[in-house]
Amino acid sequence: MQEQYRPDMIEPKVQQYWAENKVFKAIKDESKEKYYCLSMFPYPSGRLHMGHVRNYTIGDVISRYQRMLGKNVLQPFGWDAFGLPAEGAAIKNKTAPAKWTYENIAYMKKQLQLLGFGFDWDREIATCKPEYYKWEQWFFTELYKKGLVYKKTSTVNWCPNDETVLANEQVHEGCCWRCDTPVEQKEIPQWFIKITDYAEQLLGGLDTLPQWPDMVKTMQRNWIGRSEGVEITFDVANTNEKVAVYTTRPDTFYGVSYLGIAAAHPLASLAAQNNSELAAFIQEAKNAKVAEADLATMEKKGMATGLFAIHPLTGDKLPIWVANFVLMHYGTGAVMAVPAHDQRDFEFAQKYSLPIKQVIAPLADEEIDLTKQAFVEHGKLVNSDEFDGKNFDGAFNGIADKLEKLGVGKRQVNYRLRDWGVSRQRYWGAPIPMLTLENGDVVPAPMEDLPIILPEDVVMDGVKSPINADPNWAKTTFNDAPALKETDTFDTFMESSWYYARYTCPQYQNGMLDAEEANYWLPVDQYIGGIEHATMHLLYFRFFHKLLRDAGFVTSEEPADKLLCQGMVLADAFYYTSPTNERIWVSPTQVTLERDEKGRIIKATDPEGRELVHSGMTKMSKSKNNGIDPQEMVEKYGADTVRLFMMFASPAEMTLEWQESGVEGAKRFLGRVWNLVYQYQQNPAKTSLDLTALSAEQKVLRREVHKTIAKVSDDIGRRQTFNTAIAAVMELMNKLTKASLDSEQDRAVMAEALSAVVRMLYPITPHICFELWQALGNESAIDTAEWVKADEAAMVEDEKLIVVQVNGKVRGKVTVATDADEDTVKTIAFADENVKKFIDNQHIVKVIYVVGKLLNVVVKP
């Protein structure tokens, strides 16, 4: 081996070896335990960012470790290649989305290979390829035949000038991103999959996932939102109409003072027929697209319809209001309002001077002030006829029973979860495989017509989808009669909901999945990705697995046994304010820093000498220009250094602060490992380790080696605390660099230690370890080496080193048996030559013994 550590020379050579020998190719082998490790695949945006690097490094460390344990490891890779950004980039760069996407894939693949990830590239998937989405289209038609797919009208963002649908990201402050025309809300027919049919299974399945983060499971439980309540039907006075509401608080039923309905509710349209003011308000409310998350904080607005509902128990007439906080797609599109016991209803009632009637009192009889806020806790009923004095449970059941007997109510389990709308009025997606016949009937495209191929050689004008703009694309036939293809494309969450399963058989042509391969590899043993996917991708991922199970493709209940959600990568962000008062963000790589003695930034300047404002550590982003290019870092420091820093700087689930000083520290550490192996190699051990001939110092060093092996094995395997595993190896390295190499047994102990260090670091820094493994005299590549095992016997301490002090000053060290009592320790210590000269001819006043550690002798003349 050469004397200097040169990652620029080592890494390309090792990567070439891996590629040529297909080291990471996974083949089904029933004789071996499988291990499927998967990191969420990326959108091919053009360049890797540090978030990608962190995600894939974690997955690669786990994969390499599991391979060393003797498991048959699958670690595939692919591209979530459809999506809106490609359309924007195509318009900007005057190219086709497909061309832009494929160029990005090629570039990012090279970047990934520079980092040395052990992917099985023979299983690579790009979701924009027809051979992938063909089976997605086929599966959709099968779900349609099973009654799990339907079409209904739904609200979209509509630009009246361009006559096109806009994604939420294309609406800027209520206007079209392209022409600045005010955006309207429009109802159009869209396709839905009945995820609500699986709500109970999705909820119950969370209890079978002990190795998923609790936060993710809680977020999914809340998103599914199971509630038990009562659906109540009110008659509308002086009409034949009825209005239904759903409530989880029937105990408050006697306190209802008005009903709120959504702007899109049929009753609202009825009331607006002869009321132009109400019609205008309804239109305004419809156009003001409201996210559920904003309901609590938005200004509550409403208008009376002039209609009244009849309270089924009291006979009271309750005014019906159109309210902007009631959403048509949530529940029944109508709510019973109890201002005394719901804060939102309270704010609305106060604004419009509606009655506030108390029907719940605190259990402890304390005073409440219903002029300031609603009392929302459970309590005992008041002003509620025969139910006065009952608690929540008693009132819930009593009032529900009464409503059911009267035929105006029924107990019901509801879910917050809505069916999955999969239609997108975009071009760059998989075409939805449905056909419209001349008579208006809609039928699924037959298998022989699949895939319905998305044309890739198109021109984007930024207005209409090319398949919508082309009058001929949609034309087709069905049973020899003219038909039209659907011009909507799938939500890209469709592709990412089943890719993990297709990786098990990416070249399989006879069906969606090869059940034999799928059931060998699935479920995924370790899935890795950001927690931001908790309620979208990770829910659809679980849903699709249950659909695949019910279609007979898989036998497992859940798609992944274990989930790790890695933290974000942060970097310093700097800016200056321009003459037009705009913040100009400067890349941290262009900033010169001054720090105080504690390392805090006290001054930052850009290359022009401008003083910059340091806005702190924030998530790497284009908007703040604080992204660090992984490729630049690999070229500067080497892939192993970048990987080591990524795994060491923070626990995997926590945010990671990018500090170049930390990267430099990682490079220095690898240099020390290299130097120690080089130093050992100059005079290596010529005989094997003789455990019977070890000195006390050699036993202590060997004990440290095996204690480190035990800790690192537990940290990487069970605990997945990779940073503490690395810290343990660093601590061991400090001891090894101070160890003697003088005797043959010294060198034999060192040989064992270095073999262990190289194997422990291999999952994290594989290139340098590949080279060092060979330098240590191993003939086969480290990629086939077994994980190092701790020797239990070596960790047993049969002797202790006791520090001996005389009058508080260290005068010697003695070795005693671990179970030696105080008298034995004193006898050995007093006989030690170094100690004797300080206690001979002295009067021993007292002896203090700290068991197993220290003996202090207090003397005087």
UniProtKB/Swiss-Prot annotation:
Its main location: cytoplasm. It is found in: Cytoplasm. SUPFAM superfamilies: Anticodon-binding domain of a subclass of class I aminoacyl-tRNA synthetases, Nucleotidylyl transferase, ValRS/IleRS/LeuRS editing domain. A motif ('KMSKS' region) lies at residues 619-623. The keyword 4Fe-4S does not apply. Its EC number is 6.1.1.4. A motif ('HIGH' region) lies at residues 42-52. Keywords: Aminoacyl-tRNA synthetase, ATP-binding, Cytoplasm, Ligase, Nucleotide-binding, Protein biosynthesis. The keyword Aminoacyl-tRNA synthetase applies. GO terms for cellular component: cytosol. Signal peptide: none annotated. InterPro entries: aa-tRNA-synth_I_CS (IPR001412), aa-tRNA-synth_Ia (IPR002300), Leu-tRNA-ligase (IPR002302), Leu_tRNA-synth_edit (IPR025709), M/V/L/I-tRNA-synth_anticd-bd (IPR013155), Methionyl/Leucyl_tRNA_Synth (IPR015413), Rossmann-like_a/b/a_fold (IPR014729), tRNAsynth_Ia_anticodon-bd (IPR009080). It catalyses: tRNA(Leu) + L-leucine + ATP = L-leucyl-tRNA(Leu) + AMP + diphosphate. One of its GO terms (biological process) is leucyl-tRNA aminoacylation. Pfam families: Anticodon_1, tRNA-synt_1, tRNA-synt_1_2, tRNA-synt_1g. ATP binds at K622. One of its GO terms (molecular function) is ATP binding. PANTHER family: LEUCINE--TRNA LIGASE, MITOCHONDRIAL (PTHR43740:SF2), LEUCYL-TRNA SYNTHETASE (PTHR43740). Belongs to the class-I aminoacyl-tRNA synthetase family. HAMAP family: Leu_tRNA_synth_B. This is Leucine--tRNA ligase. It comes from Haemophilus influenzae (strain ATCC 51907 / DSM 11121 / KW20 / Rd). The gene is leuS.
